[in-house]
Amino acid sequence: MSEKHLTYADSGVDITKEEKTVKTLIDKLSYVRKGIGAPLTGIGHYAGLLDFGEYALAMTTDGVGSKVLIANEMKRWNTVGIDCIAMNVNDLLAIGAEPVAFVDYLALEKHEEGFAAQIGEGLLKGAEISRMSIVGGETATLPDIIKGFDLAGTCLGVVKKEDILEGGKVRVGDVLVGIPSTGVHSNGYTLVRKIIEKSGYSYHDPCPYDSSKTIGDELLEPTRIYIEVLDVLKACEVHGLAHITGSGLLKLRRVTKLGFEFSDPIEPQEIFKFLQKEGEVEDLEMYRTFNMGMGFLMILPEKDAAKAAELTGGKIVGKIVESGIRVKDLIIE
């Protein structure tokens, strides 16, 4: 074992440089439409919001990322369509919008027997869970550009203007209700693959903690779609929502500048413990890269917290404080 602790940057993904690239791109996007369809917010939240009378249209775009490389290695593609839809739908839910339509973009190196049917199977399952239609898409064969394949999509949602959740309602003392993830979901896979490479394991090896499935099977567990959050929005007073994806708990800064104190966090699944041990990854790096067992967070007044937890299978994990992000004694920010 090396004494060096593996980081996301070591695996090839430097979040700081990525943020600078995104900012440079956004700075060039100065044109703003007026009238119907005009943006209601700036770029940078979970979804873009467009004026549509009494309602706002919400739009997200996202992809599966390098998780598709594990799907290729396993020759198992029937779950990545769920991931593609989940990454978009969960971002819509995080601003209070209901998903209504989806289009996908599939770029591939070559056509392989059984591939398209399995991709379609996953997309269909994700759409059914999300209660929305897939209304189109694009497939491109790009052997000079793509090695393997890439899968992404764009999702459209609707929300009444008065029901938009951008974080402005969050107050000190609000209760945090976390909803469990199904595992790694669809972020941090460049680091995951680096860890597996370093460990000497293969994706076809049995999980050390569950021999009934392989490491590859565990890593291909599809991202949970948190559609039940819509039930919470109808039944409870919700002040804020967060989809915990890339950058881990640092993603909470999209919601509020106030602090998050996780005094009773959700226990990370065994896959995170395995990855941390094999990669010798420090606690801080884990929480700044992965969801660590909690894929979605709801922020509510105390009176509604228990109800929200009941509706989603979640649990009360902490509260809003003045500043910082802390998981027990671990300072994230």
Swiss-Prot record:
Pathway: Purine metabolism; IMP biosynthesis via de novo pathway; 5-amino-1-(5-phospho-D-ribosyl)imidazole from N(2)-formyl-N(1)-(5-phospho-D-ribosyl)glycinamide: step 2/2. Its main location: cytoplasm. Its EC number is 6.3.3.1. The keyword Chloroplast does not apply. SUPFAM superfamilies: PurM C-terminal domain-like, PurM N-terminal domain-like. It is found in: Cytoplasm. GO terms for molecular function: ATP binding; phosphoribosylamine-glycine ligase activity; phosphoribosylformylglycinamidine cyclo-ligase activity. It comes from the Archaea. GO terms for cellular component: cytosol. Keywords: ATP-binding, Cytoplasm, Ligase, Nucleotide-binding, Purine biosynthesis. It catalyses: 2-formamido-N(1)-(5-O-phospho-beta-D-ribosyl)acetamidine + ATP = 5-amino-1-(5-phospho-beta-D-ribosyl)imidazole + ADP + phosphate + H(+). One of its GO terms (biological process) is adenine biosynthetic process. Coiled coil: none annotated. InterPro entries: PurM-like_C_dom, PurM-like_C_sf, PurM-like_N, PurM-like_N_sf, PurM_cligase. Belongs to the AIR synthase family. This is Phosphoribosylformylglycinamidine cyclo-ligase. It comes from Methanosarcina acetivorans (strain ATCC 35395 / DSM 2834 / JCM 12185 / C2A).
